[in-house]
Design a protein with these regions (language model features):
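Membrane-embedded alpha-helical segments of integral membrane proteins
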Residues: 16-79
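C-terminal/domain-edge helix-coil "capping" segments
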Residues: 70, 95-130, 199-201, 224-225, ...
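Short beta-strand->alpha-helix linker/helix-N-cap micro-motif
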Residues: 114-229, 234-243, 277-282
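Residue at a conserved register position within TPR or TPR-like alpha-solenoid repeats
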Residues: 299-300, 334, 370, 404-407
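Structural signature of tandem alpha-helical TPR/SEL1-like repeats
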Residues: 305-311, 337-349, 373-381, 406-422
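TPR alpha-solenoid repeat register
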Residues: 326, 360, 396, 432-433
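Canonical tetratricopeptide repeat
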Residues: 329, 399, 435-436
C-alpha cells in the first residue's frame, strides 16, 4: 500500500464494502426466510427478531474479519481478532438474553380490526403467529363399573372442549366429533364407537392432524366423589407433559379442574372479554341436560340417526332452555331435516344466550342465522371473518369453502379454492377434501 492510498481505496482493496453488503443482504434473506418458516410451521414469530439482533450486533466482528482477510493473498488470524470476535459473540448472547422479556411482552395475542358483514369495524383478539396451541381430547374410559355413565366418556371431553375454547384465542380444543379425519381413521381401525383408543394410535392421529397436544383419560367413583385422571401428551414426541388426578363433588367441577391444569401448562389466562367461568355457568346448569345433549351428538355422529339426535336436543332444552350450545346445534339439525322455520326460530333463541357460546360456536350460529334467511353473502362474510380470527381452524376453513362454493360467484369460487388450499396445508392427509 502506498502512502497516498486513501482510506476508501484501502477498504475497497480489502473488500470490506463488498463483504459488508453481502452480509447485510444475507441478513435480509435470513429474516425473510425465517418469516416464511415461522408462518409455515407455526413457530413463534419473534424468532426472526432474535436473528436480526444477533446479526446486527455481530456486524463489528464481520467488518474486522473482512478488513484483515478480505485482501487477496493468504492472511493469518491476529490477536485482536482472537479476542474481539469471541467477545462480540458473548455480547450478542447477553444482549439477546436481556432483551428477551422486551421482545416477549404481550407477544401471545394481538388485536385484529376487521370489517364485519354489516360494514362496521370490529376488533378481535387473535393469537400471534406461532403462539397458538391446538388440543384434541380423545374420549375417556369409564372405570366406574356403571354402564349408565358411559355417556360421560363423550361428555367429559366435550365439556372440557367448550370450557377451554372460551378462555383465550391462544388455545383451541376439539374432540373426534369435530374432526372427520379422526373419525375416518378410527373407523378404519375398528373403533366405531370412538372409545377405547390405544394411546399410541391416539398420538399418531393427533400428530396426523397436526395438533400440538392430546388428552387421554378415565373417570371413576370414590364413594360420592367423582374422580378423573388425565394425561396431557405432546403430539410430536409422544411424551407425557402433565398428568392430573383429582376428585370433585360433581362431574362438571371435575372437568373444570382439568381445564385449569391444561391452561397452567402454558400459563394461559383469560383474555379481555373472555373468562374461565365454571362449566355450570356457561355450558349448562343441568348435568341431565348435558347428558341429553351428548346423547344427541352420539346418535348423529355414530349412528347417523338425526331424528333421535333432534329428540335428545329437544329434551336437553326442555330441562335447560338457556342451553345455547344445544339450541344452536338443534337449529343445524332442523335445517338439514328441511324444517327451515324451526331452524330459524331455534337460532334466534340461541342468539339471546350467545354470551354462553365458545368463539367458534358464536361464528357458526351467526353465519347460520343469515343462511336460514337466504342471505348467503353475509353468511359467507361471517365465516370468512372466522377463518381470519382462527386461521388454523379446519372447521372454519371448510365451512367457508363450502358456502363460497354454494354461492358460486367468481370471487366466491376463488375464496373457496384458497380455503381448500389452506386446509390441505394444515391437514395434508385429509383426503376427504378431494371428494368435496
Amino acid at each position: 500500500m502506498t502512502e497516498t492510498e486513501s482510506l476508501l481505496e484501502n477498504l475497497k482493496r480489502r473488500r470490506v464494502p463488498q463483504i459488508a453488503g453481502m452480509y447485510i443482504a444475507a441478513t435480509w434473506l435470513v429474516i425473510e426466510l425465517g418469516d416464511w418458516v415461522t408462518e409455515r410451521f407455526s413457530l413463534p414469530g419473534d424468532l426472526t427478531s432474535y436473528v436480526f439482533i444477533a446479526m446486527l450486533v455481530m456486524l463489528p466482528a464481520v467488518l474486522l474479519v473482512a478488513y484483515n482477510h478480505g485482501a487477496p493473498g493468504r492472511d493469518r488470524w491476529t490477536r485482536t481478532e482472537k479476542v474481539f470476535v469471541p467477545i462480540n459473540a458473548a455480547v450478542t448472547v447477553a444482549l439477546i438474553w436481556f432483551m428477551t422479556p422486551l421482545i416477549d411482552v404481550e407477544a401471545a395475542t394481538e388485536t385484529l380490526t376487521i370489517q364485519d358483514e354489516t360494514g362496521a369495524l370490529q376488533e378481535f383478539e387473535v393469537a400471534r403467529r406461532g403462539y397458538h396451541r391446538e388440543l384434541v381430547s380423545f374420549f375417556w374410559e369409564n372405570e366406574t363399573g356403571d354402564a349408565e355413565l358411559d355417556w360421560l366418556s363423550y361428555g367429559l371431553p366435550i365439556m372440557l372442549m367448550h370450557d377451554i375454547n372460551r378462555v383465550s384465542p391462544v388455545i383451541t380444543a376439539g374432540t373426534p366429533f369435530e374432526s372427520e379425519l379422526v373419525q375416518e381413521r378410527l373407523r378404519e381401525q375398528g373403533y366405531d364407537q370412538f372409545t377405547g383408543v390405544p394411546r399410541g394410535l391416539a398420538v399418531e392421529l393427533a400428530r396426523e392432524r397436526r395438533s400440538d397436544v392430546l388428552v387421554v383419560g378415565n373417570f371413576s367413583l370414590d364413594g360420592r366423589q367423582k374422580v378423573v385422571s388425565v394425561s396431557v401428551i405432546d403430539a410430536t414426541s409422544g411424551d407425557v407433559i402433565e398428568t392430573h388426578t383429582g376428585s370433585a363433588g360433581d362431574w362438571m367441577a371435575a372437568a373444570d379442574a382439568v381445564t385449569t391444569k391444561v391452561l397452567g401448562i402454558w400459563e394461559i389466562t383469560p383474555t379481555e372479554n373472555q373468562s374461565d367461568d365454571p362449566i355450570s355457568e356457561h355450558f349448562s346448569s343441568s348435568l341431565e341436560a348435558v347428558e341429553h345433549y351428548v346423547l344427541g351428538q352420539v346418535a348423529i355422529k355414530l349412528r347417523g340417526n338425526y331424528p333421535e339426535g333432534i329428540s335428545e336436543f329437544d329434551e336437553a332444552l326442555t330441562i335447560d332452555p338457556a342451553f345455547a350450545e344445544a339450541r344452536s346445534l338443534l337449529s343445524v339439525m332442523q335445517f338439514l331435516n328441511g324444517d327451515i322455520d324451526a331452524a330459524r326460530a331455534s337460532a334466534t333463541l340461541a342468539m339471546r344466550n350467545s354470551y354462553r357460546l365458545s368463539t367458534s360456536s358464536e361464528f357458526i350460529l351467526k353465519a347460520n342465522r343469515y343462511i336460514y334467511d337466504g342471505d348467503y353473502e353475509r353468511g359467507e362474510r361471517v365465516l370468512e371473518i372466522w377463518s381470519n380470527v382462527q386461521p388454523r381452524s379446519t372447521q372454519a376453513l371448510q365451512s367457508m369453502a363450502q358456502i363460497a362454493q354454494i354461492r358460486g360467484t367468481p370471487e366466491s369460487l376463488d375464496k373457496s379454492i384458497a380455503a381448500y388450499d389452506r386446509l390441505l396445508e394444515l391437514r395434508p392427509n385429509y383426503h376427504t377434501i378431494y371428494r368435496l
